[in-house]
């Protein structure tokens, strides 16, 4: 466990972000390939090949490939013609960013590929991804929107009460 830092976290320089993004991409690429290759080889050479297993392996490979490509696109650095760094791209290691969720998806899919070697019921673990996406959508978009609508409906009553109170005060002043 890392020791607690005192004070604010220091800001990262653009070159440091580019280097950390490269190492992060390399790590998650190696994780995806390191889990997918043995899982594919073992499942198709040792176990029975079914339509379900073929479909789930293709789906897993699509998830891994698209997640990695999304992270690579997101973190792409831009350089000037002279080779100077103009833009470091998005920081893949930023807490609370979308890259954190994409990395979780790669970890979930890689683990599912390996667990599916034990039992085909482990393919159901992939259902956690859309469940989490729905939960995040609910917490960040739908629920605040509904509570804002309810607050707007309650405000006219409060405004009417305040208006009556102000009217009474005005009458007393006259």
UniProtKB/Swiss-Prot annotation:
Keyword Endoplasmic reticulum: yes
Compartments in which it is found: Endoplasmic reticulum membrane
Transmembrane parts of this sequence: 30-50, 54-74, 111-131
Keywords, in A-Z order: Endoplasmic reticulum, Membrane, Transmembrane, Transmembrane helix
Taxonomic superkingdom: Eukaryota
UniProt membrane topology term: Multi-pass membrane protein
One of the record's GO molecular function terms: signaling receptor binding
Region (Disordered): 151-174
Gene Ontology CC terms: endoplasmic reticulum membrane; intracellular membrane-bounded organelle; vacuole
Main location: endoplasmic reticulum
Gene Ontology biological process terms in this record: protein localization involved in establishment of planar polarity; vacuolar protein processing
Cross-referenced Pfam families: TMEM208_SND2
Regions of compositional bias (Basic residues) in chain numbering: 163-174
InterPro entries associated with the record: SND2/TMEM208 (IPR008506)
Family: Belongs to the TMEM208 family.
Biological role: May play an important role during development and helps to maintain proper levels of Fz.
Subunit-structure text: Interacts with fz.
Protein known as: Transmembrane protein 208
Organism annotation: Drosophila melanogaster
Encoding gene per record: Tmem208
